[in-house]
Amino acid sequence: MEKNFKRTTVTSALPYANGPVHIGHLAGVYVPADIYVRYLRLKKEDVLFIGGSDEHGVPITIRAKKEGITPQDVVDRYHFLIKKSFEEFGISFDVYSRTSSKTHHELASDFFKKLYEKGEFIEKTSEQYYDEEAHQFLADRYITGECPHCHSEGAYGDQCEKCGTSLSPTDLINPKSAISGSKPVMKETKHWYLPLDKHETWLRQWILEEHKEWRPNVYGQCKSWLDMGLQPRAVSRDLDWGIPVPVEGAEGKVLYVWFDAPIGYISNTKELLPDSWETWWKDPETRLVHFIGKDNIVFHCIVFPAMLKAEGSYILPDNVPSNEFLNLEGDKISTSRNWAVWLHEYLEDFPGKQDVLRYVLTANAPETKDNDFTWKDFQARNNNELVAVYGNFVNRAMVLTQKYFEGKVPAAGELIDYDKETLKEFSDVKAEVEKLLNVFKFRDAQKEAMNLARIGNKYLADTEPWKLAKTDMERVGTILNISLQLVANLAIAFEPFLPFSSERLRQMLNMDSFDWAELGRNDLLPAGHQLNKPELLFEKIEDATIEAQVQKLLDTKKANEEANYKAKPIRANIEFDDFMKLDIRVGTVLECQKVPKADKLLQFKIDDGLETRTIVSGIAQHYKPEELVGKQVCFIANLAPRKLKGIVSEGMILSAENNDGSLAVVMPGREVKPGSEVK
């Protein structure tokens, strides 16, 4: 049954203040949330958009220790960087605060105390890893070791970043402390737990029966958790950074970040509206919508609702539109590996192109499955869609109006059937876009908005007003009137998606404001209305610009490979006599050329001190022939001849293979006589 609400509270997952925001965050959470909020505002609905930085937790303390600074220094640096980046990118929060604020500390403490006083927690003693050298308990991220699944080194106590498997600290092979490097021991510690099993019955009814409209990925993950049976979850941990547990006997313990962070939505609202914040969180006529990534589904659909229900006075979320993950050039985005497109760097590299990234991220939104961002696709969507379709139509309509009517909107004359069909097409767009936005299908909604521009381009191409200018100006006026009405509709339809471009278009059209209710109308611009000078809405992005971004990623990949380089294991021992069978010599390269129809092969003529011999080597992708002429190389002289591409090769040139697959020919450190033995 359709529920009617007076207002909507929209939250977006609090970004972790231990690094900048990247495109995965934008595609998964912030762009869709901003589209939805802008849409509601255009409809004149009462909406509040809440954001803020999550400033507690282990990764922040780890970074602080690595850099030799305080956790507060870390969060101060990244909170302001993230906030500034969001502002420049057009994420239109009503408030963007932080969980280190006094308001948040007070509200989170009060929330915990109320649940504690109501008997909603249980106390449990458990064993946890302890660093005897550092004299502290180790949280998940303070423990590293070998992953039991893929056997890569450096897996964390909660997850292996190599294979993505969720782990427990005790799963790791050869665990060690990230603080001291020593082997940790198990030690008893006491913590408070939220007994989720106590809430399982009502959660099952509330989610599985009352919210079947949730996205399949959200509904499915919740059902999986519920079917496995919910377990008590710790709400405190041993750490010196965070909100102290506000009860006696809790010295050295803070609220677990998963408990503290979602309360940040409420405290940020209170900071903005100290006198009316409860209306947005406790009134049943308020709709609560959480925008999150899939790694936060359990916290926002099961844990946080259980907290709110246990407290007793808060509303529960009505919808939790969670996205899957966005990958980058076929690889998982990773902060620790620097494999990301960072928002603040994008804003520097592409000034004035916020909407291009918004458009591409929405077009590739991982709404139902993981999706991939590539720089080539970014360029193609800009050049082939924003420039060639949307921008081209707007520019043609505006320029032709300037040329034939001095920039004034011409009156529409008698309409032919094709005019009426075109007007009918774009009048239907409002209902379709609205239907899609209401169910959080932002990718399809944007595609529908772009169809308006396609309609306009086709209409201008079919009617060819430039050919009628000498014979039928009334008809030209009608065509351009209809085209300009389409342009005005585009400005409204794209405002939630491309706010910067819509604002520029509004100024070009000399319109006062936008109203969603006007979308689909064919009289937005009255006859005689003066337009401003047309400008290009979008610019073509050249290959060199994209190649620079791709190279930046390749450099990152190379740096990661070098940092993680590990030599291959030494092979089994051989007898000395077996080694002595190899005759390794130094030869001087006399000639070198590519082997026809063979991408990898070079043909050498080598002076081996006794005669000239031919050797074929698979190093053509690593050296140009002229680089090796005159050089001395090491080769195996007594290898049985072998025919390659019709050429008899009389030996093997020795090369060292780097960790990136590149080859380096083995050469003597100083010149020796051709034929010298390598011993």
From Swiss-Prot:
GO terms for cellular component: cytosol. A motif ('KMSKS' region) lies at residues 332-336. Its EC number is 6.1.1.10. InterPro entries: aa-tRNA-synth_I_CS, Anticodon_Met, Met-tRNA-synth_bsu_C, Met-tRNA_ligase_1, Met-tRNA_synth, Methionyl/Leucyl_tRNA_Synth, MetRS_core, MetRS_Zn. Its cofactor is Zn(2+). It is an enzyme of class 6 (ligase). Keywords: Aminoacyl-tRNA synthetase, ATP-binding, Cytoplasm, Ligase, Metal-binding, Nucleotide-binding, Protein biosynthesis, RNA-binding, tRNA-binding, Zinc. Zn(2+) binds at residues 147, 150, 160, 163. GO terms for biological process: methionyl-tRNA aminoacylation. A motif ('HIGH' region) lies at residues 15-25. This is Methionine--tRNA ligase. It comes from Bacteroides fragilis (strain ATCC 25285 / DSM 2151 / CCUG 4856 / JCM 11019 / LMG 10263 / NCTC 9343 / Onslow / VPI 2553 / EN-2).
